[in-house]
Amino acid sequence: MISVDSEQGISRDRLAELLNEDLAREYQSIIAYVVYSQVLKGAAYMSIADQLEIHAKQELDHALTISRQIDYLGKMPTVNPIPVKTSEDAKAMLRFDLENENETIR
């Protein structure tokens, strides 16, 4: 959560830093959704895999928006994602996805 002093506001550098943290999470999501959508196997997961492809594209749009904001602030967008957890187990992949989403919300 961003803490903003009502009188001082937030510095441009701090805002860019926080946006870069968000951008790193967007990259993480893109990579995870691309990988998970392709390696989930079985009829039970096909509709989920299709949705993950859609989410990957949405996350790319988010990453582009955040990158523009960082550039507007005169800073360089990060190129480093948060590490992506993978597994051979479909349920574990979906659990990782849920954990990532919960962490992003915090």
Where are each of the predicted segments found?
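Iron-associated oxidoreductase/ferritin-like identity signal
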Residues: 1-106
